[in-house]
């Protein structure tokens, strides 16, 4: 209706016809035109933002936070003693479902660091407890109090039940001395191609509760790993994102 009215006015003006509008009517008309323009612009902007949000949401993998390869294990989520089906890969054992990916990841890492080997895989709760206690004792032998020793050890070694090694989904890799930072960064970069992520990266210890470890990798699946790398997420953050999307 407004568009037709404006066209009619324009036609009459061009035709030489003089039209008189009361000031109040003219003011209302111009105000209506201005508001309509603003609404149209706002609608376009809102539509654009909505499209961006939808695009961002659609980037999130269509997976469940409860998937076996996304099990979250940390001090707030202790792992029950479970014995997964294991397969030997080199000198370690891993969950049989990730054995082939582990072999491929190791082979790729060896193209960067030929001396690369796997030094740890599945570890039972009892083995984790023994490792933990040994390290606490070693710190106490340096003169630390028990509390100080526990605090120091827990920055890199998980308490029994909080270690991902119990799942068979975590591996520790070696890196030849002297080239640790350079080689470790390259290996971490290619890890998602095989479904692995560097579990405890720099700058995330306030979330993971563990200091930076360039050797500890966790299998989460290729799609999940690539998304986590792209968005700089650790597993705790990724799980929270998935759970929010599931609500």
PLM feature segments, named:
Residues 1-247:
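Extracytoplasmic cell-surface/polysaccharide-interacting catalytic and binding patches
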